[in-house]
Every structure is written in C-alpha cells, then in structure tokens.
C-alpha cells in the first residue's frame, strides 16, 4: 500500500513539473498558424491601371460568375498551390473580375457597360472575344498588350505552363505547342501537358 502511494505521488510530481516546464517553455511565442500565402487579387480596374502606370507587369484576369461551380473549383484546387501562388504574385497583377457585374468599367480611355444580350459586362465580352464560358482566364502583357483568352477550368499543371509561357517571355522564342510539349512541370505531378492551343501563338 505504501509503495502504491509513493508511485502515485511520484507520478503526480512528474506531471506537475511537466506542466510548469511547458508553461515556461516560450511564453512569448505566437500561437501556431496554418495561414498560407494567397494570391494578391485586385478587384478594381482603376487600381489595376494605377499599378500598371507605377510598375508595368503582366496581367492575369480570372473571369468568373457567382453561379459558376468550376470557377469555385479552380479557386479551391488551382489557385491555392503554393508555387503557383508565389509565381503569380511575383510576376503578374492578378485580377478577379465578375463578368456579370453591371457597373460601368473605365479602361484605357473606353467605357464598358453591361450588355443584357450577353448577360455580361462589355469589358469581359471584349477580352473573352465573345466566348462567354466560365471560368475564363485572360493573359495580358505589360501595359495591357496582346490580351489572350484561355477558356475553361485549368489544373495546376496546365496553369503552370500558361503562366511560365508568358511570365518567362517564352512566347518570344517558341510557339505554344512546342513549349507545352517539351515542358517539364515543377509545381505538381499530374496530367500530361495540355494540348489546348493559345490563340495567336
């Protein structure tokens, strides 16, 4: 019986000491966080134009709608990849644009209005060349040159190829088909390189 009491007291002492040590371990340490880097989305076209004047960069515009399920899937699956997020933030101005917004958009000296027949804003209609499918990604070079629309949901690997093709200026040296065929993905393992042609490349 005495042995049992001593064992219980010893165990209690060890437990209390452990709690004290744990409490003193790092009282000023910040609480652990799982927060990941996110894409620095721009939602104002006016802000985009101001940023372009200050520091010209390439542009990625994510054309979406509130009802588009594949848009949400792309947000969840593609635009959360850490390497992709970092590359976009370093090399692009990333824009989220609701294609169905009804306010007037002022862009490059032109006004764009909501077009009921398309159920979309004229800004989206022009950049998507009237192909109103969602999601839709539009790439632009510095100073809004050469807008290139890419329709449909895109995986991390597909977006990696598009992003680096424009972001690394490979479009100056190779046709897109050649580039995508010989590209080795670095950001993820998955499907083979996309065969979707890039308009004008």
Predicted segments with their positions:
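Short active-site neighborhood of thiol/selenol oxidoreductases, capturing the structured segment around
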Residues: 55-69, 94
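Non-globular targeting/processing and membrane-anchoring segments
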Residues: 24-37, 141, 147-201
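Detector for the c-type heme attachment site
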Residues: 72-76
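A short beta-strand-turn-helix
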Residues: 40-59, 88
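Soluble non-cytosolic domains of exported or imported proteins
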Residues: 39-43, 58, 62, 78, ...
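Thioredoxin-like thiol-disulfide oxidoreductase module
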Residues: 82-84, 89-148, 156, 161-169
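Bacterial Sec-dependent N-terminal signal peptides
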Residues: 1-25
